[in-house]
Regions:
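N-terminal, positively charged/glycine-rich alpha-helical extensions of SAM-dependent methyltransferases
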Residues: 1-15
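Conserved alpha-helix/loop element of class I SAM-dependent methyltransferases that forms part
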Residues: 26-44
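Class I SAM-dependent methyltransferase SAM/SAH-binding core
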Residues: 49, 55-104
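A short His-aromatic
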Residues: 65, 121-123
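A short acidic, Gly/Pro-enriched loop at the edge of an enzyme's catalytic core
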Residues: 106-114
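Residues lining the SAM
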Residues: 116-120, 148
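A short glycine-rich, Lys/Arg-flanked "PGG" loop and its adjoining helix->strand segment in the class I
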Residues: 129-141
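Conserved class I S-adenosyl-L-methionine
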Residues: 146-163
Length: 163
């Protein structure tokens, strides 16, 4: 599954951000809500891990809102991280990029926050359960996990009403 996901995102990396704005309902609210859930003050220093960071859209918003935050971006697709590097170039040494399958790779240190946007839903349910258990191992005491993602309703009728 990881190979198929990597291949699809590698092929679409250059168009991903434009498509995301069209495909994600309430795009601005979606990302702003994830940002606002971070329990830090604007001047706080903290370490953040972005799982499935893609082109770095959420991380760039976080870096701008929290100029003392240090960010690590994990993504499976080098082409997506190339775009993230360009986007986050102004952030300088506060950001680190790791090409890795976040479902299998473990970070080398604990983080004050772990975030993910539109990535974890690609995993099967068993993979999600395993990842969620691992994420709590990655967090410092009192750390937070924010998953901004798509979810399926209990049945097709509920999904249809949500659209």
């Amino acid at each position: 599954m990881a190979k198929a996901v990597r291949k699809a995102f590698a092929a679409d990396a250059d168009n991903y951000d434009r498509a995301r704005r069209k495909l994600v309902p309430c795009f601005d609210d979606f990302y702003r809500t994830a940002l606002e859930l971070l329990p830090f003050g604007a001047d706080d220093r903290f370490e953040l891990l972005d799982l499935g960071a893609g082109t770095g859209l959420l991380s760039a918003m976080i870096a701008e809102a929290f100029p003392n935050a240090r960010l690590t971006l994990f993504d499976l697709t080098p082409e997506m991280l190339t775009i993230a590097r360009q986007r986050l170039k102004p952030v300088g040494k506060r950001v680190k990029f790791v090409t890795a399958d976040f479902a299998k790779a473990a970070p080398s240190k604990p983080y004050d926050a772990v975030v993910s946007a539109l990535a974890i839903y690609h995993l099967p349910d068993s993979g999600k359960r395993h990842l969620f258990a691992d994420i709590f191992k990655y967090l410092t005491p009192g750390g937070v996990f924010i998953n901004a993602d798509q979810v399926a309703g209990e049945d097709a009728a509920i999904d249809e009403r949500a659209r």
